[in-house]
């Protein structure tokens, strides 16, 4: 973990933005951490299915992520990393959506940590193969959330934030970036 990321982890009060990137629906959730206790701020989703142009979807993901950062001033972002699927085109689109959300965070110099879906599920439910419904119900219980959303992409975004809370302070919490310079330094082969 980088030094600036360590500083935010050690703060007694912080806000974590969790993002579940997608080109049909982007889910997101925010939690506040005070004195090592978390509380629910909000969760929602960005509906993108009505847009046919993939580039418009990417622009909207970027803009919504910037809007969330500017409105809530998160100290950290936790983002679900793409899982490996059989459909290469779907994987490319998902990777682009994740990259655009990460670029928005990096442009505002908010530290970002990626988590694999299994790690998020394990942190929330104790089962890396838990269903979306199981994750949602566990979050509902842990954060005293009233009614769950119809689509569970919002709870997936919230789960990324909660996973990051549970993993904060551990030495190996995932891939962390604190800005473009840190990203380039850690990924020299991705930049040409």
Swiss-Prot record:
GO terms for molecular function: crossover junction DNA endonuclease activity; DNA binding; magnesium ion binding. Mg(2+) 2 binds at residue 80. GO terms for cellular component: cytoplasm; Holliday junction resolvase complex. Its EC number is 3.1.21.10. Pfam families: RuvC. Gene3D superfamilies: Ribonuclease H-like superfamily/Ribonuclease H (3.30.420.10). It is found in: Cytoplasm. Binds 2 Mg(2+) ion per subunit. Mg(2+) 1 binds at residues 20, 153. InterPro entries: RNaseH-like_sf, RNaseH_sf, X-over_junc_endoDNase_Mg_BS, X-over_junc_endoDNase_RuvC. Keywords: Cytoplasm, DNA damage, DNA recombination, DNA repair, DNA-binding, Endonuclease, Hydrolase, Magnesium, Metal-binding, Nuclease. The active site is at residues 20, 80, 153. Its cofactor is Mg(2+). Belongs to the RuvC family. This is Crossover junction endodeoxyribonuclease RuvC. The lineage of its organism: Bacteria, Pseudomonadati, Bacteroidota, Flavobacteriia, Flavobacteriales. The gene is ruvC.
């Amino acid at each position: 973990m980088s030094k600036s990321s360590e500083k935010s982890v050690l703060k007694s009060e912080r806000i974590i933005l969790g993002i579940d990137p997608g080109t049909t629906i982007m889910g997101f959730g925010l939690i506040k951490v005070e004195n090592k206790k978390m509380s629910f701020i909000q969760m929602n989703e960005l509906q993108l299915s009505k847009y046919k142009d993939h580039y418009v979807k990417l622009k909207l993901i970027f803009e919504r992520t910037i809007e969330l950062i500017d409105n809530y001033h998160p100290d950290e972002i936790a983002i679900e990393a793409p899982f490996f699927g059989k459909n290469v085109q779907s994987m490319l689109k998902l990777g682009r959506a994740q990259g655009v959300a990460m670029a928005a965070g990096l442009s505002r110099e908010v530290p970002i940590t990626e988590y694999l879906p299994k790690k998020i599920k394990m942190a929330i439910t104790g089962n890396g193969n838990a269903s979306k419904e199981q994750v949602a119900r566990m979050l509902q219980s842990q954060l005293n959330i009233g009614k769950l959303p119809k689509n569970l992409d919002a709870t997936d975004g919230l789960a990324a934030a909660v996973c990051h809370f549970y993993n904060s302070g551990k030495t190996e919490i995932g891939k962390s970036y604190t800005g473009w310079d840190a990203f380039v330094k850690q990924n020299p082969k991705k930049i040409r």
